[in-house]
Regions:
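Nucleotide/phosphate-binding catalytic cleft detector across ATP-hydrolyzing
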Residues: 1-67, 72-74, 84, 121-124, ...
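Glycine-rich phosphate-binding loop of actin/hexokinase-like ATP-binding domains
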Residues: 71-72, 77-105, 203-216, 250, ...
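Detector for Asparagine
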Residues: 5, 55, 95, 109, ...
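Gly-rich Lys/Arg/Thr-decorated short loops/hinges at beta-loop-alpha junctions or inter-strand turns
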Residues: 102-116, 228-235
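Conserved catalytic alpha/beta cores of large enzymes that bind or transform nucleotide phosphates
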Residues: 115-130, 134-135, 302-319
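Intrinsic disorder/low-complexity segments
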Residues: 44-56, 136-176
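Alpha-helix initiation/capping motif
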Residues: 3-5, 9, 101, 111-115, ...
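Short beta-alpha connecting loops at secondary-structure transitions
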Residues: 111, 235-239, 291-299
Length: 319
C-alpha cells in the first residue's frame, strides 16, 4: 500500500500491485518521500525463505548517486554507492565556460550580452561526459556476482558481461550505466549555479549583488539535460550570498562549524575563494577572487600549471 505522504507517478503505482503478486523479488528504489523505480532483485530459488529468515542474499539492483563540484575552472564528479555512501569513482574536466571568460564576472557579462543558453549547454554537456566516464569506471570498482545472475541473462550476454568486468569491450543491460544514477547533488559558486540553471546573472553584477535563488532545489534531472535515470533527481544546495554559493554550503555541511564550541576558520581556495569564521554562536562569511594567484589570470609572463606545459632550460656556456 502506498502511504499518502509517499509520492510516485501513475506508471509506478500501477506496477506495484502487479509486481507484488508475482513470484519475483523486487526492490523499491526511493529517495526521501518519492518512489523512483522498481527493479528486479536477482535471487536464488530460496530467496523468499531467506528473506523471511532476515538472511537474504539476493543480488540487488545497482543504485548510484553522484556529486558534482561545478568549479569556475574545473568540474569534478564523484560516483557513490547509494546504499553505503562509498566513493566508487572520481572524474574531472576543465570547465568549458573558460572560453567565454576566465572568471565569473567575465562570464556573467558574456551571459548578459549573448544570453545564458550557450554557457548552460556547454557545462551540461561536460557534466554528462563526466557521469558517463564515472559509470564506466564503476564497472571495475563493483564486484558483480555473475553466478547469481546467470539465470537472468543468456550465455552470450554473460560472456559480454565478464569481458566488461575485466575492462574489455562488451556490456549488457545490468552493467553499471548512467541510468543507474538516481540522484545528482550539484554545488558551485552562485554564478556557476545560475548559469547552469539558465538563470540570468544580472542580480550578481549589479548592486546589491544578491542571488536570484537562495534556497535549495530538488529538480528532475532530465528537465535540465542531465542524463541519468529518467526519473532521477537533481539536488542543488542553497546559495548564501552573491559570491558565496552552494559549494560553501557543502563545506558547512561537511565541517559543521555551526555545531562547534571553538572558533574555526574554513577556507575554500579556488578561482573564487570563500572563507567562513565562527562557531555555534554565529558565522561570518566573505569571498575574494583568487584567479590571478592560482589560475594565472591577467599575468604578463608564464602560464597556468597545465598537464601539457613544457619547461625550457637555458644553459650558459663559459666564455
Amino acid at each position: 500500500t502506498i502511504q499518502r505522504n509517499i509520492k510516485t507517478d501513475t506508471e509506478i503505482a500501477g506496477s506495484l500491485y502487479k509486481k507484488r503478486i508475482s513470484e519475483a523479488e523486487w526492490d523499491v528504489i526511493y529517495i526521501d518521500d518519492e518512489i523512483l523505480d522498481l527493479q528486479p532483485c536477482f535471487a536464488s530459488q530460496d530467496a523468499s525463505k531467506e528473506r523471511q529468515e532476515d538472511n537474504y542474499k539476493g543480488v540487488h539492483p545497482l543504485l548510484f548517486t553522484a556529486a558534482i563540484d561545478l568549479g569556475t575552472t574545473t568540474i569534478v564528479g564523484y560516483l557513490l554507492d547509494g546504499r553505503t555512501g562509498e566513493t566508487l569513482a572520481v572524474e574531472s574536466r576543465m570547465n568549458p565556460q573558460m572560453q567565454y571568460g576566465g572568471d565569473v564576472i567575465q562570464r556573467a557579462n558574456y551571459a548578459l550580452e549573448h544570453g545564458e543558453d550557450v554557457l548552460s549547454a556547454c557545462v551540461r554537456k561536460v557534466i554528462n561526459e563526466i557521469l558517463e566516464s564515472l559509470s564506466v569506471k564503476a564497472r571495475k570498482a563493483i564486484p558483480i556476482d555473475i553466478e547469481n545472475r546467470k539465470n537472468e541473462v543468456t550465455n552470450e550476454k554473460k560472456e559480454a558481461n565478464e569481458q566488461a568486468v575485466n575492462g574489455k569491450l562488451g556490456s549488457a543491460e545490468w552493467m553499471p550505466g548512467v541510468e543507474d544514477i538516481y540522484q545528482v547533488s550539484l554545488v558551485g559558486n552562485t554564478c556557476m549555479h545560475h548559469l547552469f540553471l539558465g538563470i540570468s546573472p544580472a542580480s550578481l553584477v549589479h548592486a546589491p549583488y544578491m542571488p536570484a535563488i537562495s534556497q535549495s532545489l530538488t529538480l528532475r534531472a532530465a528537465d535540465y539535460g542531465i542524463h541519468i535515470h529518467q526519473k532521477g533527481q537533481l539536488l542543488l544546495l542553497p546559495n548564501i550570498a552573491g559570491y558565496i554559493g552552494a559549494d560553501t554550503s557543502g563545506c558547512l555541511l561537511a565541517l559543521r562549524q555551526d555545531l562547534k564550541d571553538e572558533i574555526t576558520l574554513m577556507l575554500d581556495i579556488g578561482t573564487n575563494t570563500e572563507m567562513i569564521l565562527g562557531n555555534k554562536y554565529g558565522l561570518a562569511a566573505c569571498s575574494a577572487a583568487s584567479g590571478p594567484a592560482f589560475e594565472g589570470a591577467k599575468i604578463q609572463c608564464g602560464m597556468r600549471g597545465l598537464r601539457w606545459r613544457r619547461s625550457l632550460t637555458r644553459q650558459r656556456k663559459p666564455i
